[in-house]
């Protein structure tokens, strides 16, 4: 076979017959095996030192991926970082520097998804990082933010505003500390600087013009609106921070801050005299510094020359105003072009009105910053000189502005379209826009320029008056502007008729029902400010507004109606009433006198339902009441003894009434005392008893209940009060004791007291334990050698004394509530027996043991033993030795048939030691015993 034939044989094509399978090749791969899928949800890498997320990546791995060239990897790293930090928050503190440096670096990333993930991560981190922690790294954060705001890419600029929102919300003080750079960035976001040679010699106000970028996905007006909203927020934070700083330094009074509070110092002279209360008059006084000081060190960048003054400098503020005001006017003209202006009263569409609102907000905040620095009013004159003409021309030409509502009709979903239209119209507050404009304009006017500005001032006055009188519901922001404009109008035009018209319009709004708390609070502060301003004027130039007098006269009745339904508002009413009462306002005092019975009602009055601070102010108001009739004193007594007032406030009230009485020592004529002595003593006695006449009458019907202690030797039953009521009554009685002790002619005072006890308490069969103890206490305090005790009072005292002693000796160990009464009641019982030996003798004579049951006999024996052992009573027991011996003999006779118990043995022992063994005793007792 030739070579050619061999070659053809090697490459000969195999012919297949129909119906037969193709033979398998020698190197064919078998495919008859089965496969299973292997799923790897996590990587096998593990790190025992650092926590990892679900992908087993730790913080270092995720931060290293932030430098990857692929946008998807960086986005995944940011999402993984958020997941890791949410699971392990402690990582934030340990790696805060690295986290901030890497996250802020992607603010200018070219990929939108990466920037979105960075913003979301920053929004997650910001609430978890305190300002003190982030402050060392804030220059880096601010630098990246500034780079993003001035970037040439439109998307990066838009996302930078989202970052700014987060920083303004969480760290307003830190972000406003970089105001010099950021304010310039705001200007560059909406404008550009003209660089032509002809503008070199012009001022800086004419070198900036609004910029238009056709490549942006938003319209120029929409973009400017976004920037102006952020600029308004930034200036608001700057103004708030500057106001707080100046207030902490004491450079100006607190003015328009609704959250401003002033804390008064309450001095208890009794504690102060005993060195129990330290009075610190000044905030930073004393040896220890004030730990809540607002002082903070500023960060120095490049030495002292690098300190960011921002708008705190007058020159910097004027420079920024010169740049931004012309741009804001251009935005206004663009939103409301003069050539397309419609007649006054026609509406403006939604988006232009939003731009106008932000323009006015920014100007208003700049005016607020200027007022904080303008101590000599030079800046105010400069603002009026440069911008009043432009403002009148552009702003006041179509004043007031209204919103044009555009209803979008849809056939399929009519309800949805109407709802959508309502939402759009509600997003715009054209009333607030007009009020902001009015506030800006009236701030440029003063009394000296009133004739020049009378035309547009009259427009504003008319608008303000109509807004107040139309009865529309205003929110707190609208009302704050409205009242600010009204106050400024009253200052620059102090005309009585115009002022009265404005006050009357505000009072019309005040009389509306259902006003929310912030609105009612602002109205109260406004009227209070007017009243205080009028009071500061001399009597020669003082003008008493009739509307203001009517408002003051209605405050006590409002307080009585309001009660505890709104404690905050009630507190504000009380403060205003207290201020006017201290200044002896006749209308208010007359109204307060007429409403006093409702305010000081012991059941539902404001004095018992409000918090303790308000109760204290109401108690102090009692001092200013023109008269204190008997029915009012009766209610005040009930307030003291019911426990609705604390014991300290009740003591303060008793002290105030003493100062109003004729026993205070003031040298006034008798006609000046508008509280009779009889009513005053009635008040003291009612407070001393601790129970009203009706309650004592109701107690007489109680029998066989656990709270009533009944003995077989005393006609007086004892009602056991609760421990809280007992302690409160005891503390209040101390103040009554003090008031009675300082009254001269003690014997007459004692006669009045014992006659009251004989009239109202003697003859009762059920007496509260606190009442009996307090009666004993006041008798011990007042009794001296000049006092003569009534014969009708002695048996009552003896019966009450035995009932109290029986109660004290029968208290079981498990009754912890009554055990705390033991020392107080035992002390007054021993004192009354030591001071009045006749009471002791009457009590011993009432111990007829032959009428006593077997359960009460050991109590009598224990009582006699304790009386014998008590040293102050030993002399009196010797005097009544025969009577005591007879009682012991009767007890021994009754117990002769049984085994002698231990208590009886102890009684015989004490008698033999203290009576029989006395040097004067045995000879006298030998014939009897």
From Swiss-Prot:
Entries under SUPFAM superfamilies matching the protein: ARM repeat
Domain of life per record: Eukaryota
GO annotation, cellular component aspect: mitochondrion; MLL1 complex; nucleolus; nucleoplasm; nucleus
Spans traversing the lipid bilayer: none
Start-end of each HEAT repeat: 99-137
Keywords: Cytoplasm, Nucleus, Phosphoprotein
InterPro entries: ARM-like, ARM-type_fold, HEAT_type_2, Ipi1_N
Subcellular location(s) per record: Nucleus, Nucleoplasm; Cytoplasm; Nucleus, Nucleolus
Residues found modified as Phosphothreonine: 29
PANTHER family noted in UniProt: REGULATOR OF MICROTUBULE DYNAMICS PROTEIN, TESTIS-EXPRESSED PROTEIN 10
Role this protein plays: Functions as a component of the Five Friends of Methylated CHTOP (5FMC) complex; the 5FMC complex is recruited to ZNF148 by methylated CHTOP, leading to desumoylation of ZNF148 and subsequent transactivation of ZNF148 target genes. Component of the PELP1 complex involved in the nucleolar steps of 28S rRNA maturation and the subsequent nucleoplasmic transit of the pre-60S ribosomal subunit.
Family: Belongs to the IPI1/TEX10 family.
Self-association state and partner proteins as the record states: Component of some MLL1/MLL complex, at least composed of the core components KMT2A/MLL1, ASH2L, HCFC1/HCF1, WDR5 and RBBP5, as well as the facultative components BACC1, CHD8, E2F6, HSP70, INO80C, KANSL1, LAS1L, MAX, MCRS1, MGA, KAT8/MOF, PELP1, PHF20, PRP31, RING2, RUVB1/TIP49A, RUVB2/TIP49B, SENP3, TAF1, TAF4, TAF6, TAF7, TAF9 and TEX10. Component of the 5FMC complex, at least composed of PELP1, LAS1L, TEX10, WDR18 and SENP3; the complex interacts with methylated CHTOP and ZNF148. Component of the PELP1 complex, composed of at least PELP1, TEX10 and WDR18.
Record's protein name: Testis-expressed protein 10
């Amino acid at each position: 076979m030739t070579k050619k034939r061999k070659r053809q044989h090697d490459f000969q094509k195999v012919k297949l017959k129909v119906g037969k399978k193709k033979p398998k090749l020698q190197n064919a791969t078998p495919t008859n095996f089965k496969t299973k899928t292997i799923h790897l949800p996590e990587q096998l890498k593990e790190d025992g030192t650092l926590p990892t997320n679900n992908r087993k990546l730790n913080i270092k791995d995720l931060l290293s991926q932030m430098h990857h060239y692929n946008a998807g990897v960086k986005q995944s790293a940011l999402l993984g970082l958020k997941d890791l930090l949410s699971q392990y928050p402690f990582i934030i503190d340990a790696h805060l520097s690295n986290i901030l440096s890497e996250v802020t670096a992607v603010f200018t990333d070219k990929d939108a998804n990466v920037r979105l993930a960075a913003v979301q991560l920053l929004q997650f981190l910001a609430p978890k990082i305190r300002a003190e922690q982030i402050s060392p790294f804030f220059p880096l954060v601010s630098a990246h933010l500034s780079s993003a705001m001035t970037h040439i890419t439109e998307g990066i600029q838009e996302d930078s505003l989202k970052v700014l929102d987060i920083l303004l919300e969480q760290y307003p003080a830190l972000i406003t500390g970089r105001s010099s750079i950021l304010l310039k960035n705001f200007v560059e976001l909406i404008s550009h600087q003209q660089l032509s040679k002809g503008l070199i010699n012009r001022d800086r106000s004419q070198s900036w013009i609004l910029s238009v970028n056709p490549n942006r996905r938003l319209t120029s007006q929409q973009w400017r609106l976004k920037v102006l909203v952020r600029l308004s927020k930034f200036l608001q934070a700057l103004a708030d921070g500057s106001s707080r700083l100046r207030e902490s330094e004491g450079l100006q009074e607190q003015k328009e801050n609704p959250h401003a509070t002033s804390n008064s110092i309450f001095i208890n002279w009794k504690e102060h005299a005993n060195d129990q209360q330290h009075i610190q008059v000044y905030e930073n006084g004393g040896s220890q510094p004030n730990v809540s000081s607002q002082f903070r060190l500023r960060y120095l960048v490049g030495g002292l020359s690098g300190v960011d003054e921002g708008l705190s400098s007058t020159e910097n503020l004027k420079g920024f105003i010169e740049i931004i005001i012309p741009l804001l006017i251009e935005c206004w003209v663009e939103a409301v072009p003069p050539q397309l202006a419609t007649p006054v009263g026609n509406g403006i569409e939604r988006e232009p009105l939003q731009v106008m609102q932000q323009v006015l907000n920014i100007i208003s905040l700049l005016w607020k910053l200027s007022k904080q620095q303008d101590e000599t009013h030079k800046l105010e004159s400069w603002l009026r000189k440069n911008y009043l003409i432009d403002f009148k021309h552009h702003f006041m030409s179509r004043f007031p502005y209204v919103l044009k509502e555009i209803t979008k009709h849809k056939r399929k979903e009519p309800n949805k379209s109407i709802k959508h239209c309502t939402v759009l119209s509600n997003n715009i507050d054209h009333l607030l826009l007009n009020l902001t404009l009015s506030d800006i304009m009236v701030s440029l006017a003063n009394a000296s320029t009133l004739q020049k500005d009378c035309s547009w001032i009259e427009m504003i006055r008319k608008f303000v008056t109509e807004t107040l009188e139309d009865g529309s519901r205003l929110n707190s922001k609208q009302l704050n502007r409205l009242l600010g404009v009204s106050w400024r109008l009253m200052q620059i035009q102090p005309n009585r008729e115009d002022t009265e018209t404005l006050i009357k319009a505000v009072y019309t709004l005040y009389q509306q029902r259902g006003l929310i708390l912030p609105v009612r609070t602002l109205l109260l502060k406004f009227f209070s400010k007017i009243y205080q301003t009028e009071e500061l004027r001399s009597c020669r130039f003082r003008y008493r507004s009739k509307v203001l007098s009517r408002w003051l006269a209605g405050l006590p009745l409002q307080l009585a109606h309001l009660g505890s339904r709104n404690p905050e508002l009630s507190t504000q009413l009380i403060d205003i009433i207290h201020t006017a009462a201290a200044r002896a306002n006749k209308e208010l005092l007359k109204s307060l006198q007429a409403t006093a019975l409702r305010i000081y009602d012991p059941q539902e009055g404001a004095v018992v339902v409000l918090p303790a601070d308000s109760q204290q102010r109401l108690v102090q108001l009692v001092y200013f009441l023109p008269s204190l009739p008997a029915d009012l004193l009766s209610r005040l007594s009930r307030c003291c003894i019911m426990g609705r007032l604390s014991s300290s406030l009740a003591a303060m009230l008793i002290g105030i009434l003493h100062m109003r009485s004729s026993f205070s020592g003031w040298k006034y004529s008798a006609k000046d005392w508008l509280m009779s002595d009889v009513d005053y003593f009635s008040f003291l006695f009612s407070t001393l008893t601790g129970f009203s006449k009706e309650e004592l009458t109701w107690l007489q019907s109680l029998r066989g209940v656990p709270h009533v202690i009944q003995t077989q030797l005393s006609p007086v039953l004892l009602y056991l009060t609760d421990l809280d009521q007992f302690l409160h009554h005891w503390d209040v009685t101390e103040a009554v004791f003090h008031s009675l002790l300082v009254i001269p002619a003690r014997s007459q005072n004692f006669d009045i007291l014992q006659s009251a006890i004989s009239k109202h308490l003697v003859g009762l069969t059920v007496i509260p334990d606190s009442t009996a103890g307090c009666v004993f206490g006041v008798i011990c305090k007042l009794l001296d050698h000049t006092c003569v005790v009534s014969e009708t009072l002695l048996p009552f005292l003896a019966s009450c004394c035995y009932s109290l002693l029986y109660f004290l000796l029968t208290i079981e160990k498990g009754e912890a509530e009554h055990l705390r009464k033991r020392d107080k009641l035992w002390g007054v019982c021993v004192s009354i027996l030591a001071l009045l030996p006749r009471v002791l003798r009457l009590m011993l004579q009432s111990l007829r043991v032959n009428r006593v049951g077997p359960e009460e006999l050991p109590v009598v024996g224990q009582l006699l033993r304790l009386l014998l052992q008590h040293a102050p009573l030993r002399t009196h027991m010797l005097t009544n030795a025969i009577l005591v011996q007879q009682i012991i003999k009767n007890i021994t006779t009754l117990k002769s048939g049984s085994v002698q118990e231990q208590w009886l043995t102890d009684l015989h022992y004490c008698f033999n030691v203290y009576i029989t063994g006395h040097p004067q005793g045995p000879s006298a007792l030998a014939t009897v015993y």
